[in-house]
Amino acid sequence: MLIETRRWDDPEGAELRRQQRVELDARYGSSDHEPGPPPSAADTDVFLVAVSDGKAVGCGALRQLDSGSAEIKRMYVVPQMRGTGVATSLLRALEAAAVERGWHTVRLETGTAQPDALRFYRREGYREIPLFGNYIGSTLSVCFERDLTPDRTGSRCERSPR
C-alpha cells in the first residue's frame, strides 16, 4: 500500500470524499451533520490518499488550526479495506505531515453515530477533549486530540484532556 499526497481536487480523492458523505448521511439520517464550513482546497494544507493495488482506498486531510496545531479532516477508508491497517497508515502519515509543518498537536471531530471511529481513535492514542471551534454545542460531535511532541525516548506523548 502507498500513501500519496494529492491535490484536494484529485478525482479519486473527490470520489472517496463523496463515498464518505453518502455513508455519513445514512448513519445520521440527514446531510446536516457537520458544524461549520466543510474543508476546501483553500483551507486544506495536506490531502493524502491511500492506494492499494492501484486503487484509491482511503483518504485524510489536515487543516491548520493555529501555529502549533492542525485538525484531521475527511479521514475515510472504503468499507472493504477496513481492518487491514489502511486507517492506521493514513493516520500515522497525517501525524508525520503535521510534525513536518511544526504542528505538534492534532485534533479531530468524529460523531456519536460512528462507534467504530470512536474506538479507532482511542486505540490509536487519542484522548477525548471538550468540543472546540465550530463543534461547540453540537450534540452529534465527539472531539479528540493527540500531542505529537516526542518525549525523551522518541515516542509520542499523549496529552491528557483539558
Predicted regions and their residues:
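Acetyl-CoA-dependent GNAT
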Residues: 1-73, 78-80, 91-93, 97, ...
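Conserved catalytic-core motifs of GNAT/GCN5-like acyltransferases
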Residues: 8, 107-110, 118, 122-123, ...
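Short coil/turn segments at alpha/beta junctions that flank glycine-rich nucleotide-binding fingerprints
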Residues: 68, 84, 100-104
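Active-site acidic-Proline motif in GNAT/NAT acetyltransferases
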Residues: 78-80, 84, 112
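Conserved GNAT acetyl-CoA-binding A-motif
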Residues: 91, 98-110
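Conserved catalytic core of two-component sensor histidine kinases
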Residues: 115
